[in-house]
Each structure stands twice: as C-alpha cells, then as structure tokens.
Amino acid sequence: MRLIQTLSSCLCTGIIALFTACSQAPQSPIDSVNPFIGTGFHGHTYPGATAPYGAVQLSPDTRKGNWDACSGYHYSDSTLMGFSHTHLSGTGCIDLGDILFRPSLQTPLAFSHSDEKASPGYYSVNLREAGVLAELTTTPHVGIHLSLIHISE
C-alpha cells in the first residue's frame, strides 16, 4: 500500500513538473492589446499612440468629411493624408479641427497594413513609396513624431 502511495505521488509530481516546463512565459497585459479593433466598419476608433487620459492622441488620418471619417482613420483605406494630435475614439461624429502633419509632399501617401505597428502609446507605419518611416509615441502630456526620411541620390 505504501508503495502505491509513493508511486502515485511521484507520478503526480512528474505530471505537474511536465506541464510547468511546457508552459509559455507569462505575457504582459499590454501584449494582449490590439489597437486596430474598431477601426473598420462603423467602430470610429483609431490605432494611434495615446496614454490613458492623455492630452494628445497621435494617429494617422486616412480620410475626412464623411461619417466613416469620425476618428480620422478607417481600416479599409490604403492611403493616408498625414498625422494629427487629437482624436476621439468611438464618437460617431466629426468633432475635432485637427492640424495635419505631413512627413512628405506627396498626398495621399500609400501604405500597407502589414507595414503598420501599434501598441499602447506607440504607432508606426512604413510609407515605402514616399521613403518615410513614421513613428508616433506619447506620454500623458506630450506627443512625439519621428519621421525617418530615406533620401535617394
């Protein structure tokens, strides 16, 4: 009887050790955030950089003037006009008079969603045709634009 208890304990310990060794490293909650949720159809959200309760919301602007342009960004678009500092998410009405920053004289700027990266407080897009890598980041009070421009000879 004692042998069966010892073997059972060893077996359970081995199974627990096996599952523990096979588990993945724990993820940060930030790794689970997808800023692109709600940027299509009629969600009226934007994927740009923002801090919780932040004063600025840096994001690309892909269209203007109609109901689908309420947040300034719509996932179905493949061109963007530039980047602005104030966006409201999910409002359903065009509500801000944004000042547009353009990293290139070309308008509109073509982009691919595979060249976009977004996480809380950060957004980047590679505008390949214009030769520009645009990065946006925020703190609670400040927004920073970085545009790396490739100059061909």
Give the ranges of each region predicted by the language model.
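Compositionally biased regions
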Residues: S9-L11, Q24, E153
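Bacterial N-terminal signal peptides that target proteins for export
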Residues: M1-L11
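The feature marks either
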Residues: A17
